[in-house]
Amino acid sequence: MPSDVKVTSNLKGLEQLQKNLKTKLVAKLGIFASDNSRDDGGKTNAEIGARHEFGVLSEGLPRRSFLKDPIEIKRKELLETANKVIKANIAKEGGAEKIFELIGIAGEAIVQEAFESGGFGTWKELTDFTVNKKGGSSQILIDSSQLRKAVISKVEKGE
């Protein structure tokens, strides 16, 4: 007795998944050359950022990490976001690039939250001298917003 059953397969999703898994990309978060200059023409955002990220003890400038520490503090949330992004995009065309782009954007959001919250409460308060020098502002690292706007993410080919 002949059968009218026809078996077909669509491996496009599987093939795209395989392609995405082989893609070697990396999401980078920081201050890059294109966003490095400042309106006042003084130190670059990268120079100012490095001074605050690591501190300059010889000048009495405490460490106020806006990159490494906030990402570490919010690591669990970032990993949860990454997991959701991976599940939603891994089998899609262009999915690998989208995954890394969205993870980078999530990192940017964490950094911006750190600027708004004083490093999630970890940054040392400004001294009275510094507050007076700034005309009474006690806000940390956000007077001109140039440094925080310079922090971006980008996706590059990995090794």
Model segments located where?
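Short, Lys/Arg-rich flexible segments
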Residues: 1-159
